[in-house]
Amino acid sequence: MTVGTTIGRAPSATTTVVEQLAATMAALGTTDLFTLMGAGNLRLVHHLATGHGVAVHHLRHENGAVGAADGWARVTGRVGWCTVTQGPGFTNTLTALLTADRAHSPVVLITSDSSGLSARQAPFAGGVQGLDPELLLDPLGLPVVRARAETAAADLVTAHRRAVEESRVVVFVVPVGIDLLPAGDPPAVAAPVRRPVPEPDAAALAAAVAAIASSRRPVVVAGRGAVESGAGPALRRLAALTGAHLATTVRALGLFEGDPADLGILGGFSTPEAAAVVAEADCLVAVGTSLNFFHTRRSQFVTGRTVVHVDADAAAFTAFDEPTVAVRGDARAVAERLGAELAGRVGERARAVAPVPGGFADVSAPGRMDPRAVSVELDRLLPRPRRVYVDNGHFGGFPIMHMTHDRPGSLVWLPEFGAVGSALAASAAGALAEPDGQAVLFIGDCGFYLTMGDLELAVRERLPLVVVCMNDGAAGSELAHMKDWSVPPEQAVFGYADLAAAARGMGAQAALVQEVAGLAPALRDWDPAAGPMFLDCHISRDVRSPLYDHV
């Protein structure tokens, strides 16, 4: 995209607002669109597909359309575009909108608004489906850009710019009826620029250096901001210099792969051995992470020790526990400065070595597999490079903790709103975005029941997606809570259904797997060129996810 380039030609008598919106989206670099069409957006979808060669991916639920755009944005780093119709089409998107926004995914949702129509003249669109989207979006804190007939294309450019610069969801609202009006002048488009990060304060930097230099058992924790700034090598050098152990959040997992000091994930998914190391630390150096209550096990990992917190966003320092020293700045730049300053202040220190995680006793029984054993076997069987998507639910900790995620982004977990069923559409979009990699989704039976229609996209477009349904025939999270709260469990147990048959009925290749040895032959029988493979894995309810000890 060229800075300052004008889109299209001066409008002619036949150029409409909707045609200009489609041209603007194409000029902004839109290659893929995720949608569930309705009366309010079908013209836009038509013009994008036929006039601009945009690949249109049709979902069967509006929440899936937004979820797919979110997945696309997470994998590509580009704006995810999605569109739905007015009224109930819009309200169906709210869960996915909050998930994407809390993940800081740059997503633009285009929705129509029929609330301004006369119910007499348009009894369905105006009377039945009429709803002002801002009535719901404003209380949720989701930004809205409303199109005006004379400036609609320029308004869309504004929505796109905000999504990129603020790294969040923006909802672009198009009032029904303006789409067929004559378009105004085409807008100029400048490539959006991320907000600049300030140089670190010298006094804060000096305080951080002093705190780290005086520590004897430091742990360096990297988050998403460290990944995005390319801080990995500088943080490895900092750890080697100070004798620190290394750890990451889930979104940075794999950043320190192969380093002997790497403890893996900090927080609820820490191994017992890693948690013991962090519990003995006297200084936590958190770089590019919010250091939220999951990371710190409800403050246990930060209480009574020095915390040096480095982030580009000053809001990170007050969102959770207050750090001892806060340094605002780019993660890589600050890490390099810390290393340079500490090189002359710390004596020779022994390199930290992470403890070897312990194993587990496989509790698989006839017809019911240990979910840890399933994860370990699939880690061995599934090809690389791969990207593993994990939905929400009790099962999620097992593929996160018992599979290898060897680079940042190779694990995509969607916990931001805690919504079951967030990942199926996202994983399908990821498979679209990375045709040369292997996309693998782990989802529970409850999540699959909620979003089963999203599988149809993968079937129709023949996406080589592996869907692993961790089917415990129950509401697994609620079982864990019921046990903790001494509530009888029978209301959370539903029984094991043959979900492979359901997936097969939708056109997927599928296998019911009830023993770990059955995974290999099921995958051998899969033809990736023919579309997705659905593995209905019947797992035991007797293995508790360690995350539930800390939530």
Residue ranges of predicted features:
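Short glycine/proline- and acidic residue-enriched helix-loop micro-motifs
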Residues: 7-8, 139-143, 191, 353-368, ...
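Thiamine diphosphate
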Residues: 106, 118-131, 318-320, 326-328, ...
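Generic recognition of flexible, low-complexity loop/linker segments
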Residues: 159-160, 206-209, 235, 273-274, ...
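A short, charged, Gly/Pro-tolerant segment at domain boundaries
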Residues: 175-180, 357, 366-370, 374, ...
